[in-house]
């Protein structure tokens, strides 16, 4: 049946966007609006926010994927606009290697991004960026440096305009294509 809501979040990863902030050196904000294809990533944040203004100005940022153990820091980053949220949440970081934005130490994945295109729509600004570097916590990669998807446990954002909640993965996982006897290869899917 049709639902009447102005917002619908159907399970998006919560991200911490790190950016250069001349008042505080670096700062962070939360978002659940992102996607990545190849070496491109797109993130969306509210137009005229402190983060949006600074990312527009400096054309670079980081995407940091937190886990549930630091949810209190995630919420501080989301509820205190224009303040020194890195200091308030006691977030530790290192500057990026290719961008002047923070790589957050307690996040399981961090991505350094350079803005390529900016699209404003409906009170939100979408930053389309090229990925310059990916940094992953040791516990989620194997000996060959490949991501262990089974160990990856981000926070998901689900809800509508009336209620929003955080969700987490359970321990169940399956390889892509297992349900139909296929596998995903670099050059495309194979079956049989």
Model-derived features with residue positions:
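Basic, polyanion-binding surface patches
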Residues: 1-192
